[in-house]
UniProtKB/Swiss-Prot annotation:
It is found in: Nucleus, Nucleolus. InterPro entries: Sof1 (IPR007287), WD40/YVTN_repeat-like_dom_sf (IPR015943), WD40_repeat_CS (IPR019775), WD40_repeat_dom_sf (IPR036322), WD40_rpt (IPR001680), WD_repeat_DCAF13/WDSOF1 (IPR051733). It comes from the Eukaryota. Belongs to the WD repeat DCAF13/WDSOF1 family. Residues 353-441 are annotated as: Required for nucleolar location. Part of the small subunit (SSU) processome, composed of more than 70 proteins and the RNA chaperone small nucleolar RNA (snoRNA) U3. Component of the DCX(DCAF13) E3 ubiquitin ligase complex, at least composed of CUL4 (CUL4A or CUL4B), DDB1, DCAF13 and RBX1. Its main location: nucleus. The keyword Nucleus applies. This is DDB1- and CUL4-associated factor 13. Keywords: Nucleus, Repeat, Ribonucleoprotein, Ribosome biogenesis, rRNA processing, Ubl conjugation pathway, WD repeat. Pathway: Protein modification; protein ubiquitination. Residues 413-426, 436-445 have a biased composition (Basic residues).
Length: 445
């Protein structure tokens, strides 16, 4: 007698533990699910609404400075350590885990103009208005010992910025000229000067480490190679660039923060015009810093706000502000890509989430799966008008809101004026300048 027996694999329907979810057989044939897209749209809409409900980006404020915060530096080896320099010459080392100051140093007379940490994290360098470069140990002195710098270099002019090489015992300073220093020498290895104006900021390329760039008060951005005796290239803009930052993942890309309220992303190989123009600020942009992924950057502005921009987007995806926060002078993105730190005029350092609605701490597997699913749904439907409107909605201070309206009116007036000038001129005599290239005056090699 022949008997046919049903044979099932228990792995397909039996849970491994009693805490697992029950396995439900599903048929994913689209013909059986005609309302799949409307259901997904509703879920995407609800996920977008909940994202705005839970958007609480502010985490903490670090107070302790007695004057405005002028510069911030990250520790290359420790996520929880941050250094800040103030306008009264005071440098503080902060423990972000405990949210308290672990050490205070009276480093300079006058402003602390620049601050950078050595690549190994054992010491840091400061420059100030007293024409000195000082190297300090990261370790606290023993009981009863005085806080003294490891090394002091006295310069001939005021230093306005400093940055350290990513791998070697070399650092660069700027002021009346750009100087490349060896840590063991009291005189610069190499000096660069192009024109008579002073240099306000200098940055090493983190990938092509022999390349560095500077911003001058003559509205210029200059590229240098520390192996060559002369600068490489100079680009002159309509207005002054306050600072710049190199992309940590793309060796040739950097973003410059300009006085004309915009940020410009350049490719150092093609300096005739920027790759992208980022606009949303309503006052001068004072600082910029990239995320470790190189896909986004954060900017600080004189309009009392900070904004987060995707690299490929011309407009910001996020804006942060508080009632008490004044002009934001410096900003940094943490090395774990989770937080943003900013220092402002009213003597506070604020810690923000990089993603405003992100839940901090450990996530259960189900939470992580739901989060990833909602994120994919939002990306799928982000062009739909209702979802786009909710995702873009932000509350702004009245001052910023009114300035945005005013700038829109001014921009429209300039556009109409150009159209009328072109209409009443000989065809082809009035060119149409692109937004990317109209701010570049000259490129000098």
């Amino acid at each position: 007698m022949k008997v046919k027996v049903l044979c099932r694999n228990p792995d397909d329907y039996v849970r491994e533990t009693k805490r697992d979810l029950q396995r439900v057989p599903r048929n994913y044939d689209p013909a059986l699910h005609p309302f799949e897209v409307p259901r997904e749209y509703t879920r995407a809409l609800n996920a977008t609404k909940l994202e705005r409900v839970f958007a609480k980006p502010f985490i903490a404020s670090l107070d302790g400075h007695r004057d405005g915060v002028n510069c911030i530096a990250k520790h290359p080896k420790s996520l929880s350590t941050v250094l800040s320099g103030a306008c009264d010459g005071e440098v503080k080392i902060w423990n972000l885990t405990k949210r308290e100051c672990s050490r205070t140093i009276q480093a300079h007379d006058g402003f602390v103009r620049g601050l950078c940490v050595r690549f190994c994290g054992t010491s840091f360098f400061t420059v100030g208005d007293d024409k000195t470069v000082k190297q300090w140990s990261m370790e606290s002195p023993g009981y009863g010992e005085k806080v003294e710098p490891i090394r002091t270099i006295l310069g001939k002019t005021v230093f306005t910025g400093i940055d350290h090489h990513m791998n070697d015992a070399i650092f660069a300073t700027c002021g009346q000229q750009v100087d490349i220093w060896d840590e063991q020498r009291s005189a610069p290895m190499r000096s660069y000067a192009w024109g008579v104006d002073s240099i306000s900021s200098i940055k090493f390329n983190p990938i092509e480490t022999h390349i560095l760039s500077s911003c001058g008060t003559d509205r210029s951005i200059v590229l240098y190679d520390k192996r060559k005796p002369t600068p490489l290239k100079k680009i002159i803009l309509e207005m002054r660039t306050n600072t710049l930052c190199w992309n940590p993942m793309e060796a040739f890309i950097f973003t410059a923060a300009n006085e004309n309220f915009n940020l410009y992303t350049y490719d150092m190989r093609y300096m005739d015009g920027p790759v992208k123009v980022h606009m949303d600020h309503v006052s001068a942009v004072l600082d910029v810093d990239y995320s470790p992924t190189g896909k986004e950057f954060v900017s600080a502005s004189f309009d009392k706000s900070i904004r987060i921009f995707p690299v490929q987007s011309g407009h910001s995806r996020e804006v942060y502000h508080t009632k008490r926060m004044q002009h934001v002078t410096c900003v940094r993105w943490s090395a774990d890509n989770k937080y943003v730190l900013c220092g402002s005029d009213e003597m506070n350092i604020r810690i923000w989430k990089a993603n405003a609605s992100e839940k901090l701490g450990l996530l259960s597997p189900r939470e992580r799966a739901a989060q990833n699913y909602n994120q994919k749904l939002k990306e799928k439907f982000h062009h739909h008008p209702q979802i786009k409107r909710i995702a873009r909605h932000r509350h702004l201070p009245r001052s910023i809101y009114s300035q945005i309206k005013e700038q829109q009116i001014m921009r429209e007036a300039r556009r109409k004026k150009d159209v009328n000038r072109r209409k009443h001129s000989k065809p082809g005599s009035v060119p149409i300048p692109s937004e990317k290239k109209k701010h570049v005056l000259a490129v000098v090699e």
